[in-house]
């Protein structure tokens, strides 16, 4: 096969296939719904790896599974096989990334059903906003208690279950990052009720899209524009009212 072009490599990267270093083979990233794979799905992933990859599978830090060693020409068949088994490749690009959640659903320390909330966010924003471009990747994490095993404070948007006055409330972190540039997420000034989480998340992403520069992470936008500006925007529904206008606009370029 002729040497792959950058256009070909980038075209499949957007579908969840990352080139393996020094080869023309790819790792396909399979994203779970609500962080959970069924036994049947895992059997299918193993079969997919044997048919199209090198027989190996690796868990990612965002609770997805990567299947390495897939030849470029086999990617369409791998996608078709995956979809026939209720599996979906993805998890790349400047948009909402795969949602992560701790085992709060079953953990003795979990204060609420973390996987149910992760599934709701997955369906509403990972899937529902799959065509929405953001200034940079946007990582969301759902934690069941202050032990923070899933590290919500180092995600762009993190949820942490807390207990106050005999009921569960939610601490929200914004702007966290990890890696080359580390920034602890900034906690919102008040804890929120469960029904407030998704509207606040959507406002955060709309604010980020309107204020962020291309290739700028949410935390850097917060530092540049001001946390007080973000909190003021979250206190009203103006961003939701202007949602279509914000999503239709071009991403800002850094001056």
Question: Which ranges hold each PLM region?
Answer:
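Gly-rich Lys/Arg/Thr-decorated short loops/hinges at beta-loop-alpha junctions or inter-strand turns
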Residues: 22-29, 182
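Intrinsically disordered, low-complexity polar/charged tails and linkers
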Residues: 1-25
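Charge-rich, low-complexity terminal tails
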Residues: 17, 26, 240-255
């Amino acid at each position: 096969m002729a040497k792959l072009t950058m256009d070909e490599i980038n075209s499949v990267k957007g579908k969840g296939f990352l080139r393996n270093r020094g080869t023309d083979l790819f790792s396909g990233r399979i994203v779970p719904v609500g962080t959970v794979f069924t036994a049947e799905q895992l059997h299918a992933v193993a079969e997919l790896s044997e048919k199209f990859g090198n027989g190996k599978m690796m868990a990612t830090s965002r609770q997805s599974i990567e299947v390495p060693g897939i030849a470029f020409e086999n990617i369409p068949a791998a996608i078709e096989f995956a979809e026939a088994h209720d599996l979906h490749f993805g998890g790349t690009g400047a948009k909402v990334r795969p949602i992560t959640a701790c085992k709060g659903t079953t953990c003795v320390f979990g204060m609420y059903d973390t996987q149910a909330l992760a599934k709701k966010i997955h369906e509403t924003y990972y899937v529902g906003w799959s065509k929405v471009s953001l200034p940079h990747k946007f990582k969301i994490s759902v934690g069941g208690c202050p032990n923070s095993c899933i590290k919500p404070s180092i995600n762009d948007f993190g949820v942490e279950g807390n207990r106050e006055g005999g009921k569960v409330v939610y601490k929200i972190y914004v702007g966290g990052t990890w890696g080359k540039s580390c920034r602890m997420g900034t906690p919102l000034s008040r804890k929120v009720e469960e029904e407030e989480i998704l509207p606040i998340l959507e406002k955060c992403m709309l604010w980020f899209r309107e204020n962020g520069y291309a290739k700028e992470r949410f935390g850097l936008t917060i530092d540049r524009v001001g946390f007080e500006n973000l909190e003021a925007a979250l206190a009203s529904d103006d961003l939701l009212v202007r949602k279509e206008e914000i999503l239709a606009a071009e991403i800002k370029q850094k001056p």
